[in-house]
Amino acid sequence: MANILKSGKLPAPARIIEEAIVGPSLGKESISAGMFSFIFALIVVLIYVALYYSGAGLAANIALLVNIFFIFGVLASIGAVLTLPGIAGIILTIGMSIDANVLIYERIREEMKNGKGLKLAVTDGYNSAYSSIIDANVTTLLTAIILYTFGTGPIKGFATTLVIGILTSLFAAIFITRLIISARLDKGKTISFATKMTQRAFQNINIDFIGKRKRYYILSSVVIILGIGSLITKGLNFGVDFVGGRTYVVRFDDAVDNEAVRSALSAVFVDENGKSSTAQVKTFGPDNQVKITTSFMIQSKDITTDKVVESKLAEGLATTGLEYEIMSSQKVGATIADDIKDAALWSVIFSLIVIFLYILVRFRKWQFSLGAIVSLAHDVLIVLSVFSIFYGILPFSLEIDQAFIAAILTIIGYSINDTVVVFDRMREYLNNNKKKGLHATANDALNSTLSRTFNTSLTTFVVLLIIFISGGEVIKGFMFALMVGVVVGTYSSLFIASTITLDTTKKED
């Protein structure tokens, strides 16, 4: 296209400043790995939900299958291209879509525990859960929309499936599951919301989360200080999205020595002025596959530069004496890298501002907003710290790229989802018993939502773990960030958000 435009009458020639190419072999492998992960994760979630919630779990499973059908139907109707990040978005939706049903079922179980009949418990359970479901999903939806607005390419695909998944999940949980349960009850039949193994799970739990908050402050502070130290001394492994350059994933027909490849490429990556550019070579998956990163001639504006670089790359790789195939390549110009970096920073900042304002409007107290934002900043810092500390240690890529920013925004959405559920219960308890202190109310809210927190976090983490293991090398770093985020987000919703809210409230209401 650049050549076509150059041959026309434009006053300035066009050149490609950002490009991503995926070879047919890698594309086929990625989609196969993604679909396998999708089916495996779906089966695991279906079994777990049925084992935990019995008959009601089967109703939730039917709704989940309908939800997936809706997602694929909407994607097909808008002509969306199914990419690996898009598949990851669908798989993540599987884990998160269970959350609405878990919220509803736990409220129904509470109503039944308080002595209500099954029909009344179902009605009141749904009515009580609506507020938490809407608030939790709106905050996640807002971050997904921001991700779509600031993201490019595959990241938009991930955000698109996430937005569609959130909306269809709400419909499936609120309408389809209730339709199935109500139809059964109207026929005079009963339905169980627990099995013998799970009917007493998380009952009579009374953990003093608030009383031990100083321990959690110290623990989080130590981890963050270590992380900041690593960020200062070691830094982060920025990908070409943020610094500009070229990357190639190359597969050889036999194991290859990374240092030999690096030396060979450094010897040929010399421009017309005699300036040499180094190449970074790392094993990418199996020992016969490497990822090559270089800034060689990335500043050049000559339209023939790409062909020159490809020729030099072929010359260097030929010295290995092995047959090879370029599985994928990516090029990001320095100007585009700066734009991506700015967009990434603003997307995170804008997400935090929007969430602060939404929590302020919904809960009418700035202390709730502050508690939420501090916990989110805590989550982001710890994920960054983990990527800095373990960069070069773990046997897979921990690059900071657009996918990582997508992971950070997803973590923000997931974590605030968790936090809002607790805040909503705190608000409910404060309205029902205004004489009870905030300390006791916060503990009651955390303990009463512990079952929901456990089930949602476990299903989401298991889904992510399955993708991490079987989804292929391309998506490992992205999934690792999400896995760390789920663990840290769950921790902060239990031990940071509510305690910050409590400590910044001058008096108990």
Could you describe each region identified by the protein language model?
Residues M1-D509:
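A structural signal for conserved, well-ordered secondary-structure elements
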